[in-house]
């Protein structure tokens, strides 16, 4: 008989220990790289809403700080209280011998309400959206990625413009490219200014709640929920970027002069999140 067909098979040699060690090391490095990428993405999302001081500072040689005031349930602010605080803040700058730059400002702020269920519709679809009333330069502090269009702000001439998140835009129109389209709220037309992606970090998810969302100006929300004769929607979050001549100045101004200083929870956001931590 030919020995080729029935030849004894060679025994396969076991893999060298060195090769196995290198293989395990490569697997471990891949796992670590994936974990780091996830963490980096998470931190980047956090930094988006914590970097207003750096954005506002620009090329200025002044130091700026970002601080926030959060209101407990039942102790929300009104816009008139914020306007009063503006006057106090400007006097604080005078007392500290801080000069307002030409064509500039020593501070910028924003405020927002807790999300409310508001019914919004098109000619064919009706949806209940988590709606947040915003004031000041809200999207300086929350520069959500635009899928289309633009943001809204207090500088708008009218309050009948809204920003949809991508989930609501898809539910209403089946598209994200809907800037300029019309939606109806309480039988009144509102123009879609833009469509944004929502923040993904845990803190933002808790603040904005789950589900399709919409941003309207604080004035619009006041109108939608009953007009000027009704109680104003409560402002639950106030955010401020301001000049800080010495460390801790911004937070101390809030603690000393904010309208609800005995009830608010204050936080300094600048440098709060860092890859070094």
Q: Each PLM stretch: what is its role?
A:
Residues 72-78, 120, 245-252:
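Short, surface-exposed beta-strand/loop "edge" segments at domain boundaries and coil↔beta transitions
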Residues 39-114:
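Membrane-proximal extracellular/periplasmic loop immediately following the first transmembrane helix
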Residues 106-151, 156:
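The feature marks short, hydrophobic/small-residue-biased sequence motifs that occur predominantly
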Residues 82, 132, 161-162:
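Solvent-exposed, acidic/flexible segments
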Residues 137-146, 164-276:
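Mid-to-C-terminal secondary-structure elements
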Residues 61-69, 107-111, 161, 211-215, ...:
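Hydrophobic beta-strand segments of well-ordered beta-sheets in folded domains
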Residues 1-47, 277:
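Gram-positive cell-envelope targeting signals
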Residues 62, 126, 134, 156-159, ...:
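Extracytoplasmic
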């Amino acid at each position: 008989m030919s020995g080729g067909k029935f030849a004894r098979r060679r025994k396969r040699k076991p893999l060298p220990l060195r090769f196995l060690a290198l293989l395990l090391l490569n697997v471990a490095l891949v796992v670590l790289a994936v974990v780091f990428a996830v963490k980096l993405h998470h931190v980047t999302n956090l930094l988006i809403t914590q970097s207003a001081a750096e954005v506002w500072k620009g090329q200025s040689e002044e130091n700026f700080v970002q601080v926030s005031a959060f209101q407990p349930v039942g102790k929300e602010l009104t816009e008139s209280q914020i306007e009063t605080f503006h006057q106090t803040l400007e006097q604080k700058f005078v007392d500290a011998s801080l000069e307002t730059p030409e064509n500039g400002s020593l501070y910028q702020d924003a405020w927002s309400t807790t999300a409310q269920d508001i019914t919004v519709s098109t000619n064919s679809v009706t949806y209940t959206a988590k709606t947040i009333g915003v004031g000041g330069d809200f999207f300086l502090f929350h520069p959500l990625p635009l899928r289309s269009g633009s943001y809204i702000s207090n500088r708008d001439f009218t309050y009948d413009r809204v920003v949809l998140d991508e989930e609501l835009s898809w539910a209403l129109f089946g598209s994200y490219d809907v800037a300029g389209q019309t939606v109806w709220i309480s039988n009144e037309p509102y123009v879609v200014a833009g469509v944004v992606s929502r923040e993904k970090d845990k803190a933002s998810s808790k603040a904005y709640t789950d589900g399709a969302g919409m941003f309207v100006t604080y004035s619009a929300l006041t109108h939608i929920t009953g007009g000027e004769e009704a109680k104003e929607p409560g402002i639950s979050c106030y955010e401020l970027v301001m000049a800080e001549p010495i460390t801790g100045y911004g937070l101390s101004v809030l603690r000393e002069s904010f309208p609800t200083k005995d009830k608010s929870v204050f936080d300094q956001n600048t440098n709060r999140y860092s890859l070094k931590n």
